[in-house]
Amino acid sequence: MTSEPASYKLVWFVPEEALDATRDAVFAAGAGRIGAYERCSWYAAGTGTFLGGEGTSPVLGEAGREERVPELRVETVVPADRLADVLGALRAAHPYEEPAYDVYPLAS
């Protein structure tokens, strides 16, 4: 019998200028708490690539052309009961038409 995880690791990719807005949004929705600490996260710089298909409106670059943009990879923890709200907050605060993010279950 498999039980649901108590928490998840949320990883998202964002341009540096939107870092604070996305962090503020996910923290306000309940992410980033570890014991008595709040707003816990980790981030590092990298390069994101994407090619917007027909009918897309990329915030950066143009549809039909592969783009390479500097981005940050941001990680934080999310309690299972806050996951849906945190993901909604991330999508609302993120500047991209299709935000890239991953959710990983954490072992207890």
Give residue ranges: language-model regions.
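Hydrophobic structural segments
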Residues: 1-108
